[in-house]
C-alpha cells in the first residue's frame, strides 16, 4: 500500500461522476478529491450502487492506497446519512477499528466507563464483534446496558449519566447496503476503518485505535482536517489500543496537525506484561472481568484500562505543550481515582438502570 501522503494526479473533481470514472481513476492510481469520494459513498448509502461496484470500489481503493481526503469524503457521506445525536460536541469517544484478532478483553469499553465517571462525557460508537469473541456492544449487553436506543435516548443517557452508546446498525441503517459485498470479498477494506470516524455525536476529542498500520496516519489526517483533538494509536504488538505488552505508535492530533512518536508504558511506571495476560473470552467472560475491575481488582487488565482511559482524558484536555508522558501521567491519576472511589462502578449501575427504563418504554 502506498504512503497515505502520496499524491495522485487528480487535484480536482472528476469531469463526470460515474462509477466508470471513479473506478478508472482508482485503478490508474489517481487519488479522488473529497467530493468524488463522497459521491461514491452517497451512491452506496442511497442503494444506487450494485454489489459489483461496491466491491470493486473497496478493493480498488485499497490497492491504490487511501488518502485522508478520500477517507474524509466517505466519512462525511456516512455522517450525512446517519441519525443525529442531539448533544453538543464537547464529548469524547474511545474506539478502535477492531480487526487486530487478539481476542483481548474489552479495554476501550471499560476505559469508557472510567472516563465517564471522571466527569468527562463519553459517547461511544460501536458494534457487535466481527473478528473477535466479544465486541463493545456485546459486552455492554452482558453488563446490563440496553444498546438498541435511538438518538434522543442516547442523548438523555449522556445528560443524566455522562455516557451513551450509539449502536452502529441503529445509527447507520444505510450501511446495510454494503454488507453483502463486504462479506463476499472477505478482506478488510476502507469500510473497516470508517466506524471510528463516523460517531453520530461528532465528538471533538477521541482515543482512536487502528489495527491497520497502513491506515493509522490516514485516520489521523482526517481528524486533523476536522480540527479534532485526538490520539490515534496502534500497539506495536498489533493491538488497536495502547498496549502494555510492548511499545505503541502514537499520532498526536492537535491544532490541525499530526505529530507521530513512539511510547513505552514503562516511561510512566506501567510494567510490561505478556499479551496473554490481556486476553479475554466471550461477552459474559469479559463482562465478569469488567465487574471485577470496577470492584477494585488490580493487575494487568487494570493497568491497560487505566492507560487507555488516561489517553482519552489527555486527548480531551489537550496536551497544551506538555509531553505525552506528562499528559498520560495526569490522566492516570484521574482514571485511578474514578475506579478506586467507586464512581465507575456506580456509573455502570445508573446507566444500565436508565437504559432498561428507556428500552421498556419504547
Swiss-Prot record:
**What EC number is given for this enzyme?**
2.4.2.18
Write out the residues that bind Mg(2+) 1: 108, 241
**Residues that coordinate or bind 5-phospho-alpha-D-ribose 1-diphosphate:** 96, 99-100, 104, 106-109, 124-132, 136
Entry's Gene Ontology BP terms:
L-tryptophan biosynthetic process
Annotated GO MF terms: anthranilate phosphoribosyltransferase activity; magnesium ion binding
Entries under Pfam families matching the protein: Glycos_trans_3N, Glycos_transf_3
Q: Which reaction does it catalyse?
A: N-(5-phospho-beta-D-ribosyl)anthranilate + diphosphate = 5-phospho-alpha-D-ribose 1-diphosphate + anthranilate
Where is anthranilate 1 annotated to bind? 96, 127
Source superkingdom: Bacteria
Database matches in Gene3D superfamilies: Nucleoside phosphorylase/phosphoribosyltransferase catalytic domain (3.40.1030.10), Transferase, Pyrimidine Nucleoside Phosphorylase, Chain C (1.20.970.10)
Give the record's cofactor note, including how many are bound: Binds 2 magnesium ions per monomer.
Record-level GO cellular component terms: cytosol
Its needed co-factors are: Mg(2+)
Which residues take part in binding Mg(2+) 2?
Answer: 240-241
Question: Which residues of this UniProt protein bind anthranilate 2?
Answer: 182
- Report the pathway entry: Amino-acid biosynthesis; L-tryptophan biosynthesis; L-tryptophan from chorismate: step 2/5
Which UniProt keywords are given for this protein, alphabetically ordered?
Amino-acid biosynthesis, Aromatic amino acid biosynthesis, Glycosyltransferase, Magnesium, Metal-binding, Transferase, Tryptophan biosynthesis
* Subunit note: Homodimer.
What is the stated purpose of this protein? Catalyzes the transfer of the phosphoribosyl group of 5-phosphorylribose-1-pyrophosphate (PRPP) to anthranilate to yield N-(5'-phosphoribosyl)-anthranilate (PRA).
Give the family per the record: Belongs to the anthranilate phosphoribosyltransferase family.
Q: What is this protein called?
A: Anthranilate phosphoribosyltransferase
What organism is listed for this UniProt entry?
Rhodococcus opacus (strain B4)
Source species taxonomy: Bacteria, Bacillati, Actinomycetota, Actinomycetes, Mycobacteriales
Amino acid at each position: 500500500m502506498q504512503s497515505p501522503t502520496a499524491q495522485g494526479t487528480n487535484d480536482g473533481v472528476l469531469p463526470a461522476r460515474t462509477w466508470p470514472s471513479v473506478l478508472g481513476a482508482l485503478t490508474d492510481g489517481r487519488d479522488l478529491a473529497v467530493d468524488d469520494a463522497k459521491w461514491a459513498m452517497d451512491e452506496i448509502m442511497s442503494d444506487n450502487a450494485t454489489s459489483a461496484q461496491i466491491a470493486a470500489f473497496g478493493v480498488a481503493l485499497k490497492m491504490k492506497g487511501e488518502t485522508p481526503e478520500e477517507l474524509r469524503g466517505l466519512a462525511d457521506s456516512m455522517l450525512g446519512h446517519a441519525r443525529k445525536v442531539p448533544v453538543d460536541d464537547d464529548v469524547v469517544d474511545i474506539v478502535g477499528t477492531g480487526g487486530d484478532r487478539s481476542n483481548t478483553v474489552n479495554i476501550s469499553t471499560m476505559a469508557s466507563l472510567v472516563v465517564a465517571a471522571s466527569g468527562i462525557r463519553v459517547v461511544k460508537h460501536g458494534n457487535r464483534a466481527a473478528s473477535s469473541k466479544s465486541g463493545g456492544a456485546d459486552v455492554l449487553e452482558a453488563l446490563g446496558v440496553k444498546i438498541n436506543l435511538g438518538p434522543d435516548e442516547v442523548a438523555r443517557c449522556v445528560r443524566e449519566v455522562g455516557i451513551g452508546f450509539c449502536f452502529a446498525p441503529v445509527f447507520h441503517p444505510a450501511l446495510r447496503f454494503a454488507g453483502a459485498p463486504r462479506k463476499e470479498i472477505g478482506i478488510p477494506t476502507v469500510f473497516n476503518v470508517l466506524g471510528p470516524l463516523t460517531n453520530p455525536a461528532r465528538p471533538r476529542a477521541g482515543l482512536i485505535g487502528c489495527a491497520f498500520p497502513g491506515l493509522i496516519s490516514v485516520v489521523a489526517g482526517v481528524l486533523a482536517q476536522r480540527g479534532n483533538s485526538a490520539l490515534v494509536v496502534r500497539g506495536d504488538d498489533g493491538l488497536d489500543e495502547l498496549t502494555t505488552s510492548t511499545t505503541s505508535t502514537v499520532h498526536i492530533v492537535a491544532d490541525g496537525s499530526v505529530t507521530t512518536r513512539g511510547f513505552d508504558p514503562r516511561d510512566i511506571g506501567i510494567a510490561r506484561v505478556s499479551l496473554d495476560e490481556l486476553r479475554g473470552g466471550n461477552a459474559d467472560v469479559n463482562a465478569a472481568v469488567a465487574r471485577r475491575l470496577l470492584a477494585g481488582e488490580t493487575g494487568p487488565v487494570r493497568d491497560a484500562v487505566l492507560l487507555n482511559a488516561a489517553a482519552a482524558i489527555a486527548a480531551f484536555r489537550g496536551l497544551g505543550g506538555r509531553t505525552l508522558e506528562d499528559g498520560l501521567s495526569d490522566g492516570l491519576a484521574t482514571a485511578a481515582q474514578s475506579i478506586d472511589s467507586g464512581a465507575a462502578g456506580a456509573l455502570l449501575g445508573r446507566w444500565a438502570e436508565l437504559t432498561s427504563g428507556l428500552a421498556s418504554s419504547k
